[in-house]
Regions:
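A short, surface-exposed loop/turn module that caps and links secondary-structure elements
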Residues: 33-60
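Enriched for short, Lys/Arg-rich terminal
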Residues: 1-3, 9-25, 29, 50, ...
């Protein structure tokens, strides 16, 4: 099981998600899978990122609700970097 670390930017992004009344249960399901080191279903479109987020991964909680994260296996940590819409993040 991975320990979760949230960046300060993720915490700001999260406040926007809550204000938008997004379905938090969908996020909790994805988070649970990641914490327990289980692979995500294809519907989440989990993939590696390049550019500014090189070394990170992105998954789609909903078609326009993304989660950017990375896993540090050596210290068993899941770091949540950003969450929001495509226009919020890119």
């Amino acid at each position: 099981m991975l320990k979760v670390k949230m960046t300060s930017q993720f915490k700001k992004d999260w406040k926007k998600i809550v204000k938008r009344n997004c379905d938090i249960k969908k996020f909790e399901k994805v988070l649970s899978l990641l914490i327990n080191e289980q692979s995500l279903d294809e519907k989440y479109k989990d993939h590696k990122l390049i550019g500014d987020y090189n070394g990170c991964r992105e998954c789609h909680i909903e078609p326009d609700w993304l989660l950017i994260y990375y896993i540090e296996n050596d210290i068993l940590t899941l770091t949540l970097l950003r969450t929001g819409t495509h226009s919020d993040l890119f």
